[in-house]
Amino acid sequence: SNKPAFDTIVASGSRSSSPHSETSMNRVETPIVVDWGARYDHYCSDITRTFIDSERQEEIWNIVLEAQKEAIKTISPGVKFADVDKAARDVISEYGYGEYFIHSTGHAFGLDIHENPNISSKSEGVLEENMVITAEPGIYIPGEFGVRIEDDVLVKKNSEVLTSLDKKLDFTL
């Protein structure tokens, strides 16, 4: 890469319950949400991973992963933006965490890190072949913690996840 696509977001512990947490000098706790991207020849990437270390965090992480998989399954030319959002949101709601999914399921990106369309329930329009979007559902429990998994997806008949980094990363704090 030539440089970062945006300022990296690192949030841990209860601060991870805010999707765009500001940096602090607080001691690192778990989970740790890291959102970063690279810029290459003017084009951006955008990825988020969450490092977890408890059964409760893993339970939430698994729900978010299931929601992301369902969203990615729907990504294809001609599919409504709102339908991609609904696929992720329905999974999270089925587990009783719907009120804690507080942002859109994704967004387009390219020369800028956030481009239209947003992939949300309010978005009108349909996916077009060769768009590049994120799939990034999350659950954010105020005062406790948050979990987000974000990958970049190329819209095709059989859409392709462009992110190659493992979703679940082992670590010791």
Locate each region found by the language model.
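Active-site neighborhoods and metal-handling regions in enzymes and metal-associated proteins
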Residues: S1-L173
